[in-house]
Amino acid sequence: MKFFALFIYRPVATILLSVAITLCGILGFRMLPVAPLPQVDFPVIMVSASLPGASPETMASSVATPLERSLGRIAGVSEMTSSSSLGSTRIILQFDFDRDINGAARDVQAAINAAQSLLPSGMPSRPTYRKANPSDAPIMILTLTSDTYSQGELYDFASTQLAPTISQIDGVGDVDVGGSSLPAVRVGLNPQALFNQGVSLDDVRTAISNANVRKPQGALEDGTHRWQIQTNDELKTAAEYQPLIIHYNNGGAVRLGDVATVTDSVQDVRNAGMTNAKPAILLMIRKLPEANIIQTVDSIRAKLPELQETIPAAIDLQIAQDRSPTIRASLEEVEQTLIISVALVILVVFLFLRSGRATIIPAVAVPVSLIGTFAAMYLCGFSLNNLSLMALTIATGFVVDDAIVVLENIARHLEAGMKPLQAALQGTREVGFTVLSMSLSLVAVFLPLLLMGGLPGRLLREFAVTLSVAIGISLLVSLTLTPMMCGWMLKASKPREQKRLRGFGRMLVALQQGYGKSLKWVLNHTRLVGMVLLGTIALNIWLYISIPKTFFPEQDTGVLMGGIQADQSISFQAMRGKLQDFMKIIRDDPAVDNVTGFTGGSRVNSGMMFITLKPRDERSETAQQIIDRLRVKLAKEPGANLFLMAVQDIRVGGRQSNASYQYTLLSDDLAALREWEPKIRKKLATLPELADVNSDQQDNGAEMNLVYDRDTMARLGIDVQAANSLLNNAFGQRQISTIYQPMNQYKVVMEVDPRYTQDISALEKMFVINNEGKAIPLSYFAKWQPANAPLSVNHQGLSAASTISFNLPTGKSLSDASAAIDRAMTQLGVPSTVRGSFAGTAQVFQETMNSQVILIIAAIATVYIVLGILYESYVHPLTILSTLPSAGVGALLALELFNAPFSLIALIGIMLLIGIVKKNAIMMVDFALEAQRHGNLTPQEAIFQACLLRFRPIMMTTLAALFGALPLVLSGGDGSELRQPLGITIVGGLVMSQLLTLYTTPVVYLFFDRLRLRFSRKSKQTVTE
C-alpha cells in the first residue's frame, strides 16, 4: 500500500521518472545499429592454397590432407570441409558461436605454419586465409565496364587499386574480383614452326626467362660521386618480346615472332564476367561474420566517390547489386506495423472505456514502455532488426494489458462513487499482485529461450530479452505512472459517452449478460467441458505431428543467386556461351532489374549469377514465384542447368552449393562414395518433395590419358621430366617469367597457340629435343586415349564427401523433404560404408526439431514454478495453465489455414501464447480467491462472480493483444514472410482460446477445488483414525 501511495501522492517525481525512462530510450534508439536479423553468423575462415597444374586428386592428397590434419586440431572447429580442383584447394573452417574470429585466425595461421613442411615444394606461395564465408551472398557487387580499356586492364584497376582499399573498410571480410585476370604477355607457339626451326618449347621458355631478369647491378663510385648502374634487362610489352632471338639455325637468328604470336593479354583467358550482356569485371564484397551489413554497406558507399577518382574517367564504376535497400524497406515496414499496432491498441482501450480522458493514460503508458526498451537494447548490444522490432510490436499488446488491468479496476471504483485518489490507491492495491503475476509469469516463458544454445538460441535471444524488458518497464509504469494519472486525471463519476459509442457500450453489456447465462449452463455441465478440454489436448498433439515444418520462413530479399552446372567435359568457349544464353533469358524477365555473372577459373564447367529483382511494389510476384516461372524457361536450354535460389538473411555452413539445402554423403572408401552418390542423387531427383537436385561430385570430366613407354624413352634419350615439361609448356598456360611494374607484378604466359589445340591431333605435333639434340615426336614414346577423371575432390573432416543440394518446390516444407530423403535412403539399402547426414541449414533444422517440444515443455514448467511460488499452491497454476491447449489448437489450425509451415517464428508465437492466454485465467483466479477469502462465497459463486467482473478487462486485454498482432498478419511488402507467421500464430491462438477459456477455466477451477476438498477430507479422516 505504501509503495503505491508513494507514487500516487508524488506526481512530479512519478512524471520525472517516466520522462527519464523516455529520454534514455530516445538516446538508445539514436545509437542502435540497424540489421536484418540479430547477429547469428558463424565464425568462418577460408584457407586457400595453389599448385598450378596439379590434378584435383593430387591437390587433395598432397595439399588438402596435410592442412586438414593440422587445422583439425584447432579448438572450437565445428565443421571442416574442403574442395580440391585443378591447381587449387580451398578449406572452409566453421567455428562455434562463442569462438572469437581473431583468435581463431591466429590459430589457423599457426596450423598452416605447422603443416608447411608437409606441403609440396613446388607451391608458388604459402597457403593464405580469409575471415569470410564464401557461401554467403555478397553484400554488394561493383562492376567495372569500359569501351576503351580491355578486360585485363579493368581487372588490374579492380584488383590493384579498388579491392585493397575496399578491404580496409570496417566490416569488409573479403573482396573477390572476377571476370578476367591480371594483364600478361601471352606467347602462343606454333608447333610446326618450332619443329621446322629445330627449337623446343623448353628452349623458348629458357630464352624468355633469361632475357627478362631483374637483378641488382651495383654502382660505380669515385671520390666525390656515386652512379647507380641501370640496364635494360627487363622486357615489358609484347612488342619488346616479339624480336627476341631464341635460337640460331644454320647461322640465322630465329626470333620469337617467327615461331609464336606474342600479344598483350591476360594471365588466364578462361575467365569471363558480364553485367546485363556487357563484358564486365565484378568486385564481390562479403562482410566479416560479426560485421553489421547496413553499416558496412554505408561505409562502402561513402568511399565510392573517392574510389571513382582513382580510376580513369573512361571506366564506369557502378553498383550492380546492393543488399541493403530491401533490408531498409523491411525495417520500415516493421516500424509502420509497430505504429499501427499502437494505434489499434489505444483504439480498443477507447472503445471499452468510452472516455478520452481515460484513454490518454494507456496512450502514455505504452510509448513510455516501448521507448524505454531501446535503452536496454543499446546496453545489451542489440540492433534494430526484424525480430527486435517484431518483439516491440507484440509487446504493444502486453504493455497495455498491465495499464488496462489497473485502469479498469480504478475506473470501476470511480463509477461506484469513490474519490479519485482513494480509488487509485484501492484499485491498484487490489490488482497489484495480479499485474505482478501476469508480468513475471510472462517473462518466465522466455527463460528457456535465453538458455537455448546454438543458432536458434542466438537468433531468439534478442527477441526474448527485448520483450522481457518491455514487460518489465510496463510493470513499473502500470504500478506507478498509471495509478498516479488515474488519481489526478479521472473524475468520480461515470464518463459522458458520445452517442456513437453508446451502441458499443450496450453491445458490451449484452455480451456480458449472454456470457453470464451461458456460463451458468456450462457450470452445470462440467463433464462436457472437461471432455472438450481433453479433446483440445489430443488435437494439439495430432496437429503438431502432422503440420509441415521448416527452420525459418523463406524470405523474399529481392536478390537471387544462380549456380550454373554444365557437362563436365565442356570447353570454356562453350561455357561462356551458356552464361550469355542464361543471362539473356533472365534479363528478359519483366521482374528482373539487373543480372551479373561470371564463369571460368579452376572449374570451367560452372558459373555464378547474381540477380536483382525489381522492388516489391513494382512486381506482383514473390521471389519464389519468379524462380518457378524462370525454371520452366531455363530447362529448355540444353547442355547445362541453372539452379536459382532466393538469397536469405540466414545461411548456415560454409559450403558453396547451387541450392538452399544440403545432404552430405561421407565415406572412408572413395570408390564406394563414387558408386553410390549417382544412385542416391538420381533417386532424390525423382522425389516430388525436392527440386533442383544437384551434386558437387564432379568425377566424370574428360581426360586425355598419356601412357609413356619408358623403355623407348630411355633408348631415345628422353626422361619423364622433359616429357612432362613439354606438356606443361604446351597446354598449361605456364607462367615463365615476371614483369615488374610499380603497382603490381605481371606474368609472361606461354602455351601452344589455341589455333593449334582445337582437337586431339595437337598431341601429334608435339616433340621433345633429346640429349643428342634431335626432335623426337611425342607419339614415338607415348600413347593416349580418352578417359574420365574428377574435376574436384571434396572432403568433410578427413573423409571423402559429396554434397547433394536441393531446393523446395512450392507447397513443400523442409520436414517433407527430410522425411522423403530418409525414406529414400532406407529404400536404396545404402551400405554402412556410406553415411548420409543433413548439412548447413537442414542440419540446424533437424537439431531444432529435436529441441522444440522440450523447449515448450520447459517454458510451461517454468511458468508453473513461478505461479506456484506466487500463489503458494500446487493447484492454482494448473488451473491457469489449462488455458494453453485451446491456444495451441488455434495457432496450429491458423497456420494450416494460411498454408504456413511451423517455423522458428511460429515457435516464438506459441511461446508468446503461453504467456498471453494465461492472463485471462490469472484475472479470474485472483478475483475468485479474493471473493472466497473475504466475501464468504462458495467456490462456484466466487468463480462465477470473478468471470463476470473480469469479463470487460479480459475482453480488453485479449482484443488489445489480438489487434496488436493483427497488423503482422495483414502486412505486406518487404519482410512480410517473417512477420506473418508470428501474427497468424498469435491471432489464431487468441481467437480460439478466447472462445474456450472463458468456460474451461472456471470448470477446471471448480474441478481442482473439489479435488482439494476430497484430499483434505481424507487427510482429516487419517488424522482422526
From Swiss-Prot:
One of its GO terms (molecular function) is xenobiotic transmembrane transporter activity. It is a multi-pass membrane protein. Signal peptide: none annotated. Keywords: Cell inner membrane, Cell membrane, Membrane, Transmembrane, Transmembrane helix, Transport. Its main location: membrane. It is found in: Cell inner membrane. Pfam families: ACR_tran. Part of a tripartite efflux system composed of MdtA, MdtB and MdtC. MdtC forms a heteromultimer with MdtB. This is Multidrug resistance protein MdtC.
